[in-house]
Swiss-Prot record:
Gene: RPAP2
Name this polypeptide is given: Putative RNA polymerase II subunit B1 CTD phosphatase RPAP2
Coiled coil: 33-68
One CC-aspect GO term: transcription preinitiation complex
Zinc finger annotations (RTR1-type) as residue ranges: 77-160
Pfam families per record: RPAP2_Rtr1
Described function: Protein phosphatase that displays CTD phosphatase activity and regulates transcription of snRNA genes. Recognizes and binds phosphorylated 'Ser-7' of the C-terminal heptapeptide repeat domain (CTD) of the largest RNA polymerase II subunit POLR2A, and mediates dephosphorylation of 'Ser-5' of the CTD, thereby promoting transcription of snRNA genes. Downstream of EIF2AK3/PERK, dephosphorylates ERN1, a sensor for the endoplasmic reticulum unfolded protein response (UPR), to abort failed ER-stress adaptation and trigger apoptosis.
Modified residues (N-acetylalanine): A2
Amino acid sequence: MADCAGPSSAGRKAGAPRRSRKAAGTKQTSTLKQEDASKRKAELEAAVRKKIEFERKALHIVEQLLEENITEEFLMECGKFITPAHYSDVVDERSIVKLCGYPLCQKKLGIVPKQKYKISTKTNKVYDITERKSFCSNFCYQASKFFEAQIPKTPVWVREEERHPDFQLLKEQQSGHSGEEVQLCSKAIKTSDIDNPSHFEKQYESSSSSTHSDSSSDNEQDFVSSILPGNRPNSTSIRPQLHQKSIMKKKAGHKANSKHKDKEQTVIDVTEQLGDCKLDSQEKDATCELPLQKVNTQSSSNSTLPERLKASENSESEYSRSEITLVGISKKSAEHFKRKFAKSNQVSRSVSSSVQVCPEVGKRNLLKILKETLIEWKTEETLRFLYGQNYASVCLKPEASLVKEELDEDDIISDPDSHFPAWRESQNSLDESLPFRGSGTAIKPLPSYENLKKETEKLNLRIREFYRGRYVLDEETTKSQDSEEHDSTFPLIDSSSQNQIRKRIVLEKLSKVLPGLLVPLQITLGDIYTQLKNLVRTFRLTNRNIIHKPAEWTLIAMVLLSLLTPILGIQKHSQEGMVFTRFLDTLLEELHLKNEDLESLTIVFRTSCLPE
C-alpha cells in the first residue's frame, strides 16, 4: 500500500508546476491580444483623423478657390489635394455667385441661356451646353475640363506615398468647344468596320435579341473573310464549286428518293451553261434566261438547289454592279448586315418617291384652284369698280368658256318673258357661275288643286264669320306674346362680322406679298392700299376660298396688281409697265409657270361686254 501511494503523490507534485506554467502562458497571450487590439484601434483612429484632416483641407481649398484673385501656381498646387468631385463643386459654387467656373478667370457671367442644346452652324454639330453655362467663354470651359482631367481620382488621404502629377494649363491661343457633342446618329459602315465587326458592335450597335436567344451561334466567327473592293472574278471560277455541290446533291437524292434524277440532271446542265456566261457583257441575260426558265418550270417548290442557283446568280449580278468581291460571310453577320442595308434602302426609296412628282399635274391643280377662287370672289360690284359705275353686262359671259359645268333641271328652267334690268341679269349670271350655289333657289313644286280649293273655302268661311261678329282674331295676341318672349338683339358690329374678318385676313395675306412685287413699279404699299382695300370689299368671301398657300397668294397678288395698274395710271407700254412685265416673267419662270397661265387667271375679271 505504501509503495502504491508513493508514486501517486509524486505525480500530483509534478502536475502542479505544469498547470501554473499553462495559466501563465494564457495570461500572457490575453495580454498580447489586448495590446494588439488597442494598437489597431489607435491606428484606426489615427487613419480616421488623417482622413478627416485631409477632407477638411480639401474643403478649405474649395472655399479658397471661390475667390477672384487666383494665380496659376496656387491652382496647380491645389490640384494635388483635391479630387474631381471637389473641383466640380468649385465650378458650381462659382457659377451660383455669377462668376466664371474657371478659377483663373475673373469675369462675371452674363445672361445665361435657358436651352439645353446648341446647334453650331460652323461645325454642323449639336452640343450639350449644360456644363458650358457655368463659364463665360468656350476657352474657359475647355481649360477647366483640361485641368479637371489631370486631377487624380484616388482619395486625398492616400496620396502621401504617390508621386504628385505635373499639372499643365491650357494656353489662351487654343480654342475651346461649345459644349459636349451630342451623337445624333451612328457613323456609316466602312470597310474597316466590316473587317473588325466586334469593334463595330461595341461602339455603334446594341446587342440584338437574336444574338442572345441563339446560344449555339455565340462561338461562331462573325466573318470568315473580308469584303474587298475590286473586279469580280468570272463565273467560270465558281463553276467547279457549283458543279461539286450539284454532284453532292445528286448523290443525296439517289439515297433519299429516286424521283429527283431528272431534276438533278437539269441542274447539272444549267451549271455547265452558267460557266459560259460573261458578267462584263449583255450576253448574260440572253444566255441565262432560258436555262433559268427551264429550271423554274420543271422544279417543284420543295427543291432547294435550283433556288440557291437562282439566288447565287442574282447576287452575282448585284456584286458585278457594285464591284465588290464577297469571299465569305457567316449566317449571323449576314443577317446583321441584311437588316442594316434594308433600312438604308427603305430610306432611299422613300426619298426618291417623294421627289418624283410630276410638275405638270401640280401646275394644273394650282391653276384650277386659283380659277375657282377668283370666280367665287368676283361680283357685279367688282366689275363696276374695275370698269366704271355705268358698266352693265350683256348676255355674253367670257368666263363660261373657263368654267364648264353640267346643267341640271333647275338651271334649264328660266323665264324668257321676264324684263329685268341689265344689272339684274348680270347679277344672276354671276350667281349661276358659282360652284357653291345652293339648292335654295330651286323652284318648288306646285301644290295640288284639292289643297288650294280647301284653303280657299276655309278663307271664305273665316271672312263670313268675321263680318257676322263670331270670329275673333288671335294674331295680335300671338304677336304680343312673341315680342315678350324674345328679347331684342343688336346687329353685329364690323369688328365681329365674319365678312369683315375675312376681308381683314385677305388684306393681311396680300400685304405680306405685295411689297416685293411693287419694287419694279417704284411705289409703296401705302400708295395702292386704298384701291386694294376697295377692291377686296367687292369680293364674295367664304370660309373656304380664303385659305391658300404662300405661292398661291403670290399669284393672286400678281393678278390683282395687274388689274389695278390701269386704275393707278400705269400704262402697259410705259417704262414702269415694261419693267414690271419683265419682272413678272422672271417670277413666273421661278414658279414654273408661263405668261399665258397668268393671263388665264386675269381674264376671269375681264369681259367683252360693252358699257351701257
